[in-house]
Amino acid sequence: MSNKGIQSIRGFSDILPEESPLWQYAESAIRRVLESYGYREIRLPVLERTELFSRSIGEVTDIVEKEMYTFDDRNGDSVTLRPEGTAGCVRAGIQSGLLHNAEPRLWYAGPMFRHERPQKGRLRQFHQVGAEVFGIPEPELDAEMIIMTARMLRELGLSDVRLQLNSLGTPESRAAHREQLVAYLRRHEDRLDEDARRRLETNPLRIFDSKNPQVQQVMADAPRLMDCLDSVSAEHFTVVRNLLERAGVEYEVNPSLVRGLDYYTRTVFEWVTDRLGAQGTVCAGGRFDGLVEQLGGRPTPAIGFALGLERLVALLEDQGTPGQGGAPHAYLVVATEAGAGLEMAEALRDALPALRVQMHAGGGGFKAQLKRADRSGARVALILGDDEQAAGALTIKDLRGEDGQQRLPLDDAVTYLRGLIGA
């Protein structure tokens, strides 16, 4: 029996306290933008019936065939840890009646699960912020959603990401394209690898995603879905592009962009970067006008996207973005009875709700407490001894700058701390 402590499961990572501030910064910025566009939060379960994903994502996709965490519960029902958020959001919208006679704008956040090979930017438990809008078929909404994602990336200071667009048309135009694509690939089948040959029989559009250079050469000359678009889808895509250009959002049309989920129709988009190696997609989305009906609801047009938080945080970390929260602003050194320390800490929080103040606990002399204050990362130590308590004052010791040490009446100490935190 090993005497090693229990380790986390491969591909499931802890987000440690020193990492959390950057996550909080990213999540807060994204939430602010979503709310400014009228989106409301919905909180969804991480466990759903397996049928939900096989019906929505597609039974012959890599996700359903190879990547889902699926098991039978004690009742013998097949259940799955969610690999993405859209299907659950649609299910909740149908079940609750949210989609009936309404045009809800919803957002959600949380962990998703896929049994993939862990690598940089790809974990088996990963986190997304997603958003969906239901009931609006017009291309203006496609453009607004893409413009909103551009605003999110600007708010986070990310400039080296590129927008790629494509249109997948309707199921009918995809069927016409599939016929042409299969005929082309049959002529070049000897140049396809085993995975591409398998997809040729099940889901040939996914061969555009191949990372094999030889297969990529074959696909470079393959029939393009865009050339098979029906006139309504083509006009829809033209309007989206024109609106993005009017808004100053730069993009490139990528005919090979097909997305990994079967439910997409018409507009699809991705924000990509070269700074994350092979896992360069930071945000992706598109229309799914048939999914609500497919899952048992009324015919309802819809569009959505998801942002990958691990990849977003990696970009922020790489460019040196400071996080939100983190270390305390002040560390309260208590050189008098503990009750007075508790009262002082609460009084400071009442006066300055934005102040992060950590009170010393666990015993130790004055010097030991100051060492703990320094190690905490706090900018100042607040010293409360018998003299300070009697005088209604605090001694403030600057731990990071050149202000030295000064005793101030409590009101003046609050003013000093207000300036310290910019409140």
UniProtKB/Swiss-Prot annotation:
Broad class of enzyme this protein falls into? ligase
Q: Tell me a GO cellular component.
A: cytoplasm
Q: Which UniProt keywords apply?
A: Aminoacyl-tRNA synthetase, ATP-binding, Cytoplasm, Ligase, Nucleotide-binding, Protein biosynthesis
A GO biological process this protein is involved in?
Answer: histidyl-tRNA aminoacylation
Q: Name one GO molecular function term.
A: ATP binding
Reaction equation(s) it catalyzes: tRNA(His) + L-histidine + ATP = L-histidyl-tRNA(His) + AMP + diphosphate + H(+)
Where does the UniProt entry say this protein principally localizes? cytoplasm
Q: Which domain of life is it from?
A: Bacteria
Which CDD domains does this UniProt record tie to the protein?
A: HisRS-like_core, HisRS_anticodon
Record-linked Gene3D superfamilies: Anticodon-binding domain, Bira Bifunctional Protein, Domain 2
EC number per UniProt = 6.1.1.21
The answer on whether this UniProt entry bears the keyword Nuclease reads no
Q: What are the annotated disulfide bridges? A: none
> Where is this chain's protein located in or outside the cell?
Cytoplasm
Q: Which family does it belong to?
A: Belongs to the class-II aminoacyl-tRNA synthetase family.
What NCBIfam families is this protein classified in? hisS (TIGR00442)
The subunit field of the Swiss-Prot or TrEMBL record says: Homodimer.
This protein's name: Histidine--tRNA ligase
Q: Please give the organism.
A: Halorhodospira halophila (strain DSM 244 / SL1)
Task: Name the gene behind this protein.
Answer: hisS
